[in-house]
Amino acid sequence: MDFGALPPEINSGRMYCGPGSGPMLAAAAAWDGVAVELGLAATGYASVIAELTGAPWVGAASLSMVAAATPYVAWLSQAAARAEQAGMQAAAAAAAYEAAFVMTVPPPVITANRVLVMTLIATNFFGQNSAAIAVAEAQYAEMWAQDAVAMYGYAAASASASRLIPFAAPPKTTNSAGVVAQVAAVAAMPGLLQRLSSAASVSWSNPNDWWLVRLLGSITPTERTTIVRLLGQSYFATGMAQFFASIAQQLTFGPGGTTAGSGGAWYPTPQFAGLGASRAVSVSLARANKIGALSVPPSWVKTTALTESPVAHAVSANPTVGSSHGPHGLLRGLPLGSRITRRSGAFAHRYGFRHSVVARPPSAG
């Protein structure tokens, strides 16, 4: 618009007849409020996402949520910045209006000038008012120019302040494939419910309906036997090995290292030879036998009187040949009470006895 072509009455009238800078100031305050709300929303979103993904929620779902929410948080931050900028531009437009309003000539001044000019012209009978009329017209021209300058400046400032950067559309945070999958699932639901209802009507009391029975019925007896043997042979072999090992632990070789006795039988180990033949068990308190500092049951050791033989006996003693045959049991351990009772006369325990490694010579006295 060419404001210079318009008289000051129009330009000043427009400036003084409008609503003023109030609407622009209200718009600036509104944009500032929107910027604050968007900034708080972005901060809240970022805080919640950081808290959720920090410790309690991890995995694929958490990563998917972060990937979907992060662009939206960025958009909120960008929108908050744009809203704040819009508020600043609205405030600038209001300031431009105030500046133009101050520069604009008030309409009453223009009206007074026009009235003065008309009065001077009406009373200028002899040309005595010509100079006053020229001064009044010059003042009016200045008013014209002043209003035109004010309006041109206001138009330029308001145009620059009202040039807002367009807001970007919010990003899409949903997965379009999920919508398609949901539609497909809803479409398939009636058929699924129908199949479930038909499956529920099947009578399960008939053994032929069991899949295992049908499977076993479709193979031959030989194949079934093979399956059972393959499945159970490892457990059967292990059990048999443990059984024979337990028997072998309670048997011994026969005399002379043979594997059988005189009657072809295996010998039981001495540890189990007296099972069932020992005396009744008696119990007493603080009456245990002692082997050194060790307390032992009464049936373990029966102390025999040991006397030292003279040196001559030790020198001329004839070594005795032990039994050439004896049991060689698989189990070793402490002798049982019945065995000690029967064989206590054959040998004497030498617990605590001091052995002589080198015989004392006769010359030593």
Swiss-Prot record:
Pfam families: PPE (PF00823), PPE-SVP (PF12484)
SUPFAM superfamilies from the UniProt entry: PE/PPE dimer-like
GO biological process: response to host immune response
Cysteine disulfide partners in this protein: none
Domain of life per record: Bacteria
Family affiliation: Belongs to the mycobacterial PPE family.
The protein's name in its UniProt record: Uncharacterized PPE family protein PPE25
Provenance organism: Mycobacterium tuberculosis (strain CDC 1551 / Oshkosh)
